[in-house]
Amino acid sequence: MVLAGPAVVLADAPTVLGDMSLWEYCVAKGYADVTLTKPQIGPNAAFNNWRCVTAEGDLRPFSMVQVCKWEYNLTAVQAHPIDKNDAYTWLCYSVGH
């Protein structure tokens, strides 16, 4: 008797959708602007840096994945920077296709 093991299914690699319109995202969500909280270039500058700005000047964090979902009208997305040390290198990727 031969028993087969579990089937291996390989998922497609994520596909680049493109960049993000962060200012447009923040404005569409009711904010006045978008800003960085630390320099554009530096150690891990891509992470925990971008914020939407309220009309009063308060800063509100947001998810890059949510920006990708909004930008490309998809739910199965990922967001990754090309360079973790540059805040301007985020891209959106489609997954699960």
Regions found by a protein language model. Name each.
Residues 1-11:
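Secretory targeting and sorting signals
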Residues 9-97:
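Mitochondrial intermembrane space
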